[in-house]
Every structure is written in structure tokens, then in C-alpha cells.
Design a protein with these regions (language model features):
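Primarily recognizes the serine-hydrolase "nucleophile elbow" in alpha/beta-hydrolase
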Residues: 1-60, 141-153
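Loop/turn elements at helix/coil->beta-strand transitions in domains of secreted/extracellular proteins
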Residues: 22-25, 62-65, 91-96
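Solvent-exposed loop/turn segments at secondary-structure junctions
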Residues: 32-35, 71-75, 102-106
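Short beta-strand/loop motif that positions the catalytic acidic residue
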Residues: 61, 66-69, 73
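Conserved alpha/beta-hydrolase "acid-adjacent" motif
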Residues: 74-83
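C-terminal catalytic histidine-bearing segment of alpha/beta-hydrolase fold enzymes
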Residues: 82-157
Length: 157
């Protein structure tokens, strides 16, 4: 949805909205960005897929984007992930892609990929947002994760 809001002009219901739905930057975790005939979920959107498929609406001016995928994601194949990054770059956009070998859809959840994977994704997302001026300060992902795990363990007791 975030990618569609950023890339698909027909998503805005009214062209004169005072508040745009276009984000300043995109941090995408396993996005389904190909709704075309060969893409995920096409049968549900056959009448309007061209209007909502980010892969088919790549153009210059898309916000800086970082994408995280598992190589075994069954919703979006790696070939599509790489083609998306290539087309984004060719259009003059920033698109950083991180593919995690051996992992499937939703790998970044702490319950699926574990704490190390969870923190790796957050650290890379944080660095991306710092690089583009949306975050400042020192990265505290590990400390934050440790405190959250401690809180959850305390609640469970």
C-alpha cells in the first residue's frame, strides 16, 4: 500500500487534496508491488491493476526507497525484486534492495527470523532514513529490542 501511495497517481481520490498521500521516503518490507497479469493478487484487481501496481507506475520522482525481501518469498519472486530496483534506478530514483538468502515472506518478524534478523532490518532501515535526513542521533536498535524483550518476558511471568 505504501508503494502504491507513492507511485500510483490515481490513488489520490481528489487531485486537489490539501494533504498528499505520497510519503517522503519508503521503507518497504516484502511489498507486493507487481499486481500485473503475472503478479501476486492479480485476479482480485483485474479491472484496475494498472492504476494500483507500483511496478507498472515507476517514473522519475519516486521517494527514496529501501526494500527488504527474503529470497524464498512466494508472493514476489527475486527476479521481480531485481527488475523493480533496476527500473527505479533507470528512472533516476534511489532504490536500495536487501535480499535475505534462504528466508521467505515476513522473515523480518522476530518470531520468524529471530532477533538478529529483526535488528539487522531495523538497523539498515534506520541508516537509510538517517542518510536521507529523516532521522538523527545514534542508532539504538539493539538497546530498544533488548528492552522490549525484557518487557515482554516480565509480562509473561
Amino acid at each position: 500500500m505504501a508503494a502504491a501511495c507513492a507511485m500510483c497517481p490515481k490513488i489520490d481520490a481528489e487531485p486537489d487534496c490539501k494533504v498528499s498521500c505520497v510519503p517522503n521516503a519508503l521503507v518497504l518490507l516484502n511489498p507486493v508491488y507487481d499486481n500485473g497479469p503475472e503478479g501476486y493478487g492479480h485476479n482480485s484487481v483485474t479491472e484496475y491493476w494498472k492504476d494500483i501496481s507500483p511496478f507498472h507506475n515507476i517514473r522519475k520522482g519516486v521517494p527514496p526507497t529501501v526494500v527488504f525481501f527474503g529470497s524464498r518469498d512466494k508472493c514476489v519472486p527475486v527476479v521481480t525484486v531485481k527488475a523493480f530496483e533496476k527500473q527505479m534506478t533507470e528512472a533516476g530514483n534511489t532504490c536500495e534492495t536487501h535480499i535475505y538468502e534462504g528466508y521467505g515472506h515476513g522473515f523480518f518478524h522476530i518470531s520468524k527470523g529471530g532477533r538478529k534478523m529483526f535488528e539487522d532490518v531495523l538497523v539498515k532501515a534506520d541508516a537509510f532514513l538517517v542518510k536521507h535526513g529523516y532521522l538523527t542521533g545514534q542508532n539504538t536498535v539493539a538497546e530498544w529490542t533488548a528492552s522490549r524483550i525484557t518487557q515482554l518476558k516480565t509480562k509473561a511471568q
